[in-house]
Amino acid sequence: MAHFNQNFLDSIERDLPSHLSMEDFIAYSNKPLRLSIRVNTLKISTENFIDLMSAKGWSFDPIPWCNQGFWVTISSDLQLGNTIEHLQGLFYIQEASSMLPPTALFDSHADNENDLSQFAQTRVLDMASAPGSKTTQIAALMNNQGLLVANEYSASRVKVLHANVARMGVSNCALTHFDARVFGEYLFETFDSVLLDAPCSGEGTIRKDPDALKNWDNNDNKGIVDTQKALIESAFLALKVGGCLVYSTCALSRQENQDVCHHLKTAFGEAVEFAALTELFPDADKACTEEGFLHVWPQIYDSEGFFVAKIRKVSAVERTLPEPKMQKNFPFTAAKTKQIEELTAYFEDSFAITLPTDAEIMVRDLEFWLFPKAVMPLIGKMRFQRIGIKLADALKKGYKVRHEAILALSSPTRFELSDEQAKEFLMGRDISLVEKVKPQGEVIVSYASNPLGVAKHLGNKLKNNLPRDLVKDKIALYQ
């Protein structure tokens, strides 16, 4: 049972549209959320995923605003986060409403979704990324093309963000760790698209946490609103002319939503154009405000409360701060031609993996990395925590592939494991082989034709090379 205080209910009653009722708001706020997931199309098609999981007792109800999103019913009480398919990165457990902002950001590309190269030169900024649901959704919509800068202010949450980015096989991402208010200064008019899923009071999340609003006080929100206004200004400054900014929160009040967008309009005048989201998906108009924003109340779609606004930058704005000095001592250098040839041959010969040609192979000490080409002009303008994916380490003789490279780069050559073998592998154990054959060296091990990681084939067993931090104590199997 959700715990409301009267101040919160009074605030909701002021902001709730006249065609919606407080009774429904309270009733839906007391209902548990429907379980929802998003298929990761960087690894598996939506159709193949449905076939795979339907055979394991799942049923699917499409989420109307995300082609890869579904409310799901499962026939067991398994912890989905401990299933093999989740650990492989085939899906993300994501609340349905939170799939709206990336959909709004990319809706103009929906008609060209089969053009897999349309984002090759695109730069996208996700200003507040952790834990990574929207970041990985954006990467999938971009088909790992172009550059996705994912920023997170909290140091501990950066680690979670990277873990999810790696699990989902994202390779076009650069991670940063800043107060996002710096982007307008450091990367002025750099990005084609910007997502600001702003820190907020979290009023829309009460269906996840009944105590979320127990001590709600509108006076506590002033500092949050000031931060939101500063962040949306920074986002707009970082946006190219002609680009789109999506501002979203899981708050319900006008103060944190419409008022913040109107603040931007006041600050930048005719350079700001509100883009209507009335036709983003069937029945979107049920949640639309007079400006064309989506103000999703829990009872409209039986989901979390959410707010989404899409804003176009239709003309240039003045840069008020000078361009910062270039940062020095970047620790990476471009790989030499011979190194690239050797590394390319290693991946092709060992794993039948062809390294992408639309990326840069970079070297730091004995490490080889794959950088998105679109990040190269930004080197020195901002400090990055991590760029692209780590491909391999150089040994005295040859190379040793990195786990994240196997998850991100597709290969037709795999050693397929059974349910029980996959469970053993993810628990860090070696896999005994019934038939002794000639040792094959490093091999990609897979489950349901999707990679799990790398093992060393010794003839009579597969020696587990799963990174220790990914070893699980418990794996959930379907009976």
From Swiss-Prot:
Catalytic reaction annotation: cytidine(1407) in 16S rRNA + S-adenosyl-L-methionine = 5-methylcytidine(1407) in 16S rRNA + S-adenosyl-L-homocysteine + H(+)
SUPFAM superfamilies named among the record's database cross-references: S-adenosyl-L-methionine-dependent methyltransferases
Localisation: Cytoplasm
A Pfam family it matches: Methyltranf_PUA
GO-annotated cellular components: cytoplasm
The keyword Cytoplasm is assigned to this record: yes
Superkingdom of the organism of origin: Bacteria
CDD domains in UniProt: AdoMet_MTases (cd02440)
PROSITE patterns hit by this protein: SAM_MT_RSMB_NOP (PS51686)
InterPro entries in UniProt: Methyltr_RsmF_N, MeTrfase_RsmB-F_NOP2_cat, MeTrfase_RsmB-F_NOP2_dom, Nol1_Nop2_Fmu_2, Nop2p, RCMT, rRNA_ssu_MeTfrase_F, SAM-dependent_MTases_sf
Protein family according to the UniProt entry: Belongs to the class I-like SAM-binding methyltransferase superfamily. RsmB/NOP family.
Annotated function: Specifically methylates the cytosine at position 1407 (m5C1407) of 16S rRNA.
Name recorded for this polypeptide: Ribosomal RNA small subunit methyltransferase F
Native organism taxonomy: Bacteria, Pseudomonadati, Pseudomonadota, Gammaproteobacteria, Alteromonadales
Gene: rsmF
